[in-house]
Amino acid sequence: NIWRDRFNFPILYQRHNENIGPDRNYLSAVNMGTGDYCWIFGSDDILTKNSLALMEDKLAAGSDIYLCDRRELDISMTKISNPHRRWLNGGSRLFSFSNEADLIEYFSKCNSVGGLFSYLSSIIVKRNKWSDVIFDESYIGTAYAHVYILL
């Protein structure tokens, strides 16, 4: 409720009574959403100061997917410095995956699987685009069902 009062985001939190597995958990999270965008945020991750305000500005551009970088922290919340582990080479940039040249350039800039949407808490997706994908149930159990939908 604190976030709802400060930002124009309909933030929802749900914890299932039993473990339904990662893939069904991701799918359930987006299905319960009612806003234009979904940020499936892991329970062991934290938002940095001003991240909601920053994303509120970025979402105004209307892109389908936003991939945020992350900070790695130890158990005492001290930043771990691993500059080689950024998702992508280069700064912020808009890529159109419907453009083959952009897609190839995007993949060539990926430093790790994080750039391929593996780290869920770094992904914000337009909910209607996610919902438009006909999901292949054979991806349940991979822990990467969301990557099928995003790519």
Residue ranges and their predicted role:
Residues N1-L151:
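Nucleotide-sugar donor-binding/catalytic module of glycosyltransferases
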